[in-house]
Amino acid sequence: MPEGKKPAEDLYSAKTHLHQPVPEVSTVNATALPADAPEGALPSEVRPEIVTWEKLCEAIKASGKAYNMEMITKAYDLANKAHNGVCRRSGEPYICHPLAVARLVLDLGMDSESIAAALLHDVVEDTPTTLEDLTAAFGEEVALLVDGVTKLTKIQFSNIEELQAENLRKMLLAMSRDVRVMIIKLCDRLHNMRTGDAWPEQKRRDKARETMEVYAPIANRLGILNVKEELEDRSLHYLDPVGYEEISKMLSERAGEEFLARVSGVIEQRLKESGIEGATIKRRVKSIYGIYRKTIMQNKSFDEIYDI
């Protein structure tokens, strides 16, 4: 990195005025694993299940929140028709991608307009559908969300100077107008990184670097920490597959989630015995990239890191 340049994280920590407050974002299920995932697996190690329209509807119902199903269904129908006959590089029908993005947006607790926009986020860029068509069908709010995501998608990061200057400002500007645009884009990038094995090797590395330098810091700024960590882990998997696999293997050999749950139960029981009621013990396994970064920056071996 050239002298005088700040890392992307520092740029994002600068004071930026958001014209709209950041919505309350849930981080509980944003990177939930499929039911058949191996025990102790990290989100970055498991290929996500394919989200169907039926599964999305079930998830909406299970959320217990009141959503505008008429709008969401209409958005799905339009997207399904617009992407009909198109497949992703992985071979899946293209509609699987907007459905997966919509599910991630739902899991983050976003509103009906955000879910509809997630379903529609690629139709203006990739199909004959126009912004005017969306405005007529869904109103200006949904159309503007889709337009915002489309504009972010068109931003290119060809070198580190651009990354830290003009394009970064454009991203922050889009974020300040309506933060929902950025949340949809983060979910779009997360699903693309989950399915990035189908990309050519150079594209995987380029997307991973862009994700690490741009999208993960934004997720961190918005407080969506599990999305941030999965973006970092999946990026590391493409940028340094050997380092990723080494840490992943060592983590699997250490105490996993089952052990943490058992220890948490013991602590909660001891607290109750001491007269402390209602205490909640929170636990998490440190991300692969978090461990990787610590070993590099602090020049420590895996066995010297104790906060895993």
Q: Where does each model-flagged region fall?
A:
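Active-site helical microenvironments for divalent-metal-assisted chemistry
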Residues: 2-308
